[in-house]
Design a protein with these regions (language model features):
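Hydrophobic alpha-helical membrane-association signature
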Residues: 5, 49, 131-134, 143, ...
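Extracellular glycan-interaction surfaces
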Residues: 1-10, 31-41, 51, 55-121, ...
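Low-complexity, glycine/proline/serine-rich flexible segments
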Residues: 1-26, 129, 164
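Generic recognition of flexible, low-complexity loop/linker segments
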Residues: 17-19, 82-83, 95, 135
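Extracellular, beta-strand-rich glycan-interacting domains
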Residues: 28-38, 94, 98, 110, ...
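An anion-binding catalytic pocket shared by soluble metabolic enzymes
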Residues: 46
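Extracellular glycan-interaction patches encoded by glycine-rich segments
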Residues: 74-76, 125-145, 149
């Protein structure tokens, strides 16, 4: 399988064309196939997002305590966390987050629902310093093989279909 390796520093990330995101959204989805090397308790590792300006899609793995992991999503000034994940460092996984226009954020890990948050204000895209793979207000430390951003909230069935389509490529 092909993938990019990131060192957890500000020197390794992948840029995107920010203008491609400046469209009308009927929801948002970020889906990433990744392998995390390490994260300290209390730290965030950014899978996709921005490091300056408005957060439109910032998606992270957060470790509230040693060996415990959650997906964190931050957009439009609001944010939330998934339930705890069965994540093992140095093993591939697929994380996904959807947000609908009503403010419902749903979290998925390896195709399975792992929590929701309500009341997260939905915003259309706001210009910022750019959208990046492995860079937000912190950095990814590990590998990323797939990063997909959608202009709508995928359904649970669509998340499962996408997960099923890529899982064997990364030995999940």
């Amino acid at each position: 399988a092909s993938y990019f390796t990131f060192s957890g520093t500000g020197f390794q990330y992948a840029s995107t064309t920010a203008s491609k995101f400046n469209v009308t959204y009927t929801g948002k989805t970020v889906m990433v196939a990744a392998r995390m090397t390490a994260v300290l308790a209390g730290a965030y590792r950014c899978l996709f997002g921005t490091n300056t300006g408005t957060r439109n899609f910032n998606t992270y793995i957060y470790s509230p305590s040693t060996g415990v992991y959650q997906i964190h999503y931050s957009a439009g000034g609001g944010g939330g966390l998934s339930n705890n994940l069965p994540l093992t460092t140095n093993q591939w996984f697929v994380a996904a987050v959807t947000q609908n226009v009503s403010g419902l954020v749903s979290y998925y890990f390896n195709g399975q629902a792992v929590g929701t948050n309500t009341g997260q204000t939905f915003i259309q895209y706001a210009a910022n310093g750019g959208e990046f793979v492995a860079l937000g207000d912190n950095y990814w430390y590990g590998d990323i093989g797939v990063c997909a951003v959608y202009g709508r909230a995928l359904t649970a069935d669509e998340i499962t279909q996408n997960y099923t389509a890529i899982r064997n490529r990364y030995g999940i």
